[in-house]
A protein has these predicted regions:
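Extended, low-polarity segments enriched in aliphatic/aromatic residues
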Residues: 1-26, 34-47, 51-195
């Protein structure tokens, strides 16, 4: 995994792949678990990535694996931990900023993990399509941090995908996008479609 990240960021070694992270960071790893266990990031890969982030000197209690709901994480096989453990893991569970903010064409309340808690973000999704936006390679994952994603699916999510991600809460903190490609889906997403 370290070698893959090193190649993706153009650095010569797995050790150099830790460069995007600093010991003082609070790192949020936003998963995409909407499709349940069969089409979500594999627990083993997520935990290997947590180890990579920790090896950069980030305290494990400052590594937050999160999704829009604890229920989705549990359905994908993750254990909810708001304290202790090798890393924190929980859903935002409707804990939005009290006031909306805007970015381009969108106005939304963002999850506190991206607005105030985390100083560095990682999108960790799976290789799959979305029936309206197509394949976004992790960009659509960020719809899970706004309170009203249903409003932003028109015109194949254009320009809304870009507007959500270019908000300073995300654009100023996004260090990596990682996709689990062990299981891929090219039609029928975002839910798991066995056909």
């Amino acid at each position: 995994l370290g070698g893959a990240v090193a190649a993706a960021v153009g650095l010569p070694s797995a050790a150099a792949a830790r460069a995007p992270f600093r010991p003082g960071d609070t790192v949020g790893i936003k998963l995409n678990c909407l499709a349940g266990r069969l089409l979500s990031p594999r627990l083993e890969l997520v935990e290997a990535f947590v180890d990579l982030v920790a090896s950069a000197g980030v305290d494990r209690d400052r590594i937050i694996v999160f999704e829009r709901s604890s229920r989705e994480l549990e359905r994908a096989g993750f254990v909810i931990r708001r304290s202790g453990g090798p890393y924190l893991c929980y859903g935002t569970d409707n804990q939005w900023d009290p006031e909306p903010s805007t970015s381009g064409s969108i106005g939304s309340c963002y999850a506190r993990e991206v607005s105030t808690t985390c100083s560095a973000l990682i999108s960790f999704g799976v290789v799959k399509d979305h029936d309206l936006s197509g394949v976004s390679a992790g960009i659509k994952n960020w719809y899970g941090v706004i309170h009203n994603p249903n409003k932003y699916h028109g015109s194949n999510c254009n320009p809304y995908l870009a507007d959500v991600v270019r908000h300073p809460f995300i654009a100023g903190k996004l260090r990596l996008t990682v996709l689990d490609g062990v299981e891929a889906q090219c039609q029928g997403g975002p839910a798991y479609y066995p056909g």
